C-alpha cells in the first residue's frame, strides 16, 4: 500500500514510515549484510559488529552503557520485555499492582493479564474524550502497592 499525497495516515501508533536517512542506513542489512548476528561465520560477525556499533552509538546519545541497550523486533516485543522484565525483577513484589489505561494496546493488556497469574493485580485508569489519562483518577489509583 502506498499513500496518495492527498491522504493522511492516522494509525501511526501501529506503524510509521522510516525516514530516508534510516532507510539508507539499514538498506545494506536488508540486502547484503543480513547474516544472523549469533552465528560464527563471517557474514554473522559483520552483522554482530554492526549491531554493537549501533548499540554504542545509541548509548552515547542517551548517556548510557552499551550493555544497557537492547534492540527488539518491534513494539510488541519491546512492551513485553519492559513490562514482564520489570515485574519479574527484584525491584517490585509479585503482589504489586499494575496501572494501565483503559484504552491500552493489546501488546500491554495481554502481558499484564498474564502477570495476574503470578499475583499482580491490574488497575485500569480511564481516559478523557481526547484519549488522555484522567490525572485525578490516576492519582487515586496510586498507592503503596
Which residues make up each language-model segment?
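Pyridoxal 5′-phosphate
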Residues: 1-145
Amino acid at each position: 500500500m502506498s499513500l496518495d499525497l492527498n491522504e493522511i495516515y492516522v494509525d501511526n501508533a501501529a506503524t510509521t514510515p522510516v525516514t530516508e536517512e534510516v532507510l539508507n542506513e539499514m538498506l545494506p542489512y536488508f540486502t547484503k549484510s543480513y547474516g544472523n548476528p549469533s552465528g560464527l561465520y563471517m557474514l554473522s560477525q559483520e552483522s554482530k559488529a554492526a549491531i554493537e556499533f549501533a548499540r554504542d552509538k545509541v548509548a552515547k546519545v542517551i548517556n548510557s552503557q552499551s550493555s544497557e541497550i537492547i534492540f527488539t523486533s518491534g513494539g510488541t516485543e519491546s512492551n513485553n520485555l519492559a513490562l514482564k522484565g520489570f515485574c519479574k525483577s527484584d525491584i517490585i513484589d509479585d503482589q504489586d499492582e499494575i496501572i494501565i489505561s483503559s484504552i491500552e494496546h493489546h501488546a500491554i493488556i495481554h502481558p499484564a493479564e498474564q502477570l495476574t497469574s503470578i499475583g499482580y493485580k491490574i488497575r485500569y485508569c480511564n481516559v478523557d474524550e481526547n484519549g488522555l489519562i484522567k490525572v485525578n483518577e490516576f492519582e487515586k489509583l496510586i498507592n503503596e502497592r
